């Protein structure tokens, strides 16, 4: 899935650049500029649908990638793993600021709710939130800085990806048995490069099918209404890929406790290399660990379902 993540990033940067050419980062124009892109720009609708659904595929791939890393003990490549977790955090930040840009109802209220979480930080919280907003509520300054961040962060992700690969290159990649595979090494090209094309093709078929047949199935219908600070939508919820974290946040009655639990749900990945106690690297021959692993997967799926 690593190669798929790379191609996801490339696709998102290309479609994003094309969208940025037609986008206006201003509260009075953002929503109409997105509508204009979809109606009047050649293939604008397609570019936007690919970009919006490409984000979903990015997260599908990264969750599979992390799951596989946990299952096969890849986290023992500590540097690679830690940079991977930082990549995940950067991706989540990018997706969040990007979701605010169309300036629909859910964009606005999502931004309000999530940035408000920073106010739970003792002592500096409120100052921090007003500093992030550039005022006393989510408004024009917030939108413009979010656009700047959404433009910048994908390139940060690309840079971190290179570091991620450099550290991976130090040790070589892992395998399902978790044993050294030096004797089985083969040239990357044409073998792996050809194998990766199959994954690219399958993912593109799925992505294009989704973008062409039901482009709005993963989005929130509230976002077809321009942002209105005076009317709160009945259910504020993020895109599906954040629902597990949002469910954790909402399930804890205390604000600071919820924020800490939400942060911990992702940051716990940093602890995995320290918590590995088995003599074997991979879970292939560890049925007990397998049960725990699949329980974790089931938990995440249930949280995602509950969160919606």
Curated annotation (Swiss-Prot):
Residues given in the record as a ubiquinone binding sites: 169
Keywords: Electron transport, Heme, Iron, Membrane, Metal-binding, Mitochondrion, Mitochondrion inner membrane, Respiratory chain, Transmembrane, Transmembrane helix, Transport, Ubiquinone
Residues noted as binding heme b b562 in the record, renumbered to the chain: 51, 150
Alphabetized InterPro entries for the sequence: Cyt_b/b6_C, Cyt_b/b6_C_sf, Cyt_b/b6_N, Cytb/b6-like_sf, Cytochrome_b_C_euk/bac, Cytochrome_b_N_euk/bac, Di-haem_cyt_TM
Record GO terms (molecular function): metal ion binding; ubiquinol-cytochrome-c reductase activity
Any one biological process term the GO annotation gives: mitochondrial electron transport, ubiquinol to cytochrome c
Ranges in coiled-coil conformation: none
Positions of transmembrane segments: 1-21, 45-66, 81-101, 146-166, 194-214, 256-276, 288-308
Note on how the cofactor is bound: Binds 2 heme b groups non-covalently.
Cofactors named for this entry: heme b
Binding site for heme b b566: 65, 164
GO cellular component: mitochondrial inner membrane
Cellular localisation: Mitochondrion inner membrane
Membrane association type: Multi-pass membrane protein
Any Pfam family: Cytochrom_B_C
Subunit (UniProt): The cytochrome bc1 complex contains 11 subunits: 3 respiratory subunits (MT-CYB, CYC1 and UQCRFS1), 2 core proteins (UQCRC1 and UQCRC2) and 6 low-molecular weight proteins (UQCRH/QCR6, UQCRB/QCR7, UQCRQ/QCR8, UQCR10/QCR9, UQCR11/QCR10 and a cleavage product of UQCRFS1). This cytochrome bc1 complex then forms a dimer.
Other known facts: Heme 1 (or BL or b562) is low-potential and absorbs at about 562 nm, and heme 2 (or BH or b566) is high-potential and absorbs at about 566 nm.
Function: Component of the ubiquinol-cytochrome c reductase complex (complex III or cytochrome b-c1 complex) that is part of the mitochondrial respiratory chain. The b-c1 complex mediates electron transfer from ubiquinol to cytochrome c. Contributes to the generation of a proton gradient across the mitochondrial membrane that is then used for ATP synthesis.
Family membership: Belongs to the cytochrome b family.
Designated name of the protein: Cytochrome b
Species name: Baeolophus inornatus
Gene name of this polypeptide: MT-CYB
């Amino acid at each position: 899935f690593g190669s798929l993540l790379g191609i996801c990033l490339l696709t998102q940067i290309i479609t994003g650049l094309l969208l940025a050419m037609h986008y206006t980062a201003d509260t009075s124009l953002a929503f109409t500029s997105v509508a204009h892109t979809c109606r009047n720009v050649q293939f604008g609708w397609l570019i936007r649908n690919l970009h919006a659904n490409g984000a979903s595929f990015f997260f599908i791939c990264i969750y599979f990638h992390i799951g596989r890393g946990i299952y096969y003990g890849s986290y023992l490549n500590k540097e690679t793993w830690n940079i991977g977790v930082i990549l995940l955090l950067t991706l989540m930040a990018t997706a969040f600021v990007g979701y605010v840009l169309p300036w629909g109802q859910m964009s606005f209220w999502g931004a309000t709710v999530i940035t408000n979480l920073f106010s739970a930080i003792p002592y500096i919280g409120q100052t921090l939130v007003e500093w992030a907003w550039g005022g006393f509520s989510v408004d024009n300054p917030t939108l413009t800085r979010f656009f700047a961040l959404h433009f910048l962060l994908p390139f940060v992700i690309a840079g971190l990806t290179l570091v991620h690969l450099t550290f991976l290159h130090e040790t070589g990649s892992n395998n399902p048995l978790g044993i050294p595979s030096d004797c089985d090494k083969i040239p990357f090209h044409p073998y792996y490069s050809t194998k990766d094309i199959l994954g690219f093709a399958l993912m593109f078929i799925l992505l294009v099918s989704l973008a062409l047949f039901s482009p709005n199935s993963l989005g929130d219908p509230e976002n077809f209404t321009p942002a209105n600070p005076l009317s709160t939508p009945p259910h504020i919820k993020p895109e599906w890929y954040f629902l597990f974290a949002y469910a954790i946040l909402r399930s804890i009655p205390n604000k600071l406790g919820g924020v800490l639990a939400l942060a911990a749900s992702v940051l716990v990945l940093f602890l995995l290399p320290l918590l590995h106690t088995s003599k074997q690297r991979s879970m292939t021959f560890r049925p007990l660990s397998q049960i725990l692993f699949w329980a974790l997967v089931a938990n995440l799926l249930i949280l995602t379902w509950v969160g919606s």
